Amino acid sequence: GVIDAAKKVVNVLKNLF
């Protein structure tokens, strides 16, 4: 869902920074 996608994006950003 949209929420799951948003959480995935947040996790990726955290990994990058």
Swiss-Prot record:
It is found in: Secreted. GO terms for cellular component: extracellular region. Keywords: Amidation, Amphibian defense peptide, Antibiotic, Antimicrobial, Secreted. The keyword Secreted applies. GO terms for biological process: defense response to bacterium. The modification Phenylalanine amide is found at F17. Expressed by the skin dorsal glands. Shows antibacterial activity against B.cereus, L.lactis, L.innocua, M.luteus, S.aureus, S.epidermidis and S.uberis. This is Uperin-3.6. It comes from Uperoleia mjobergii.
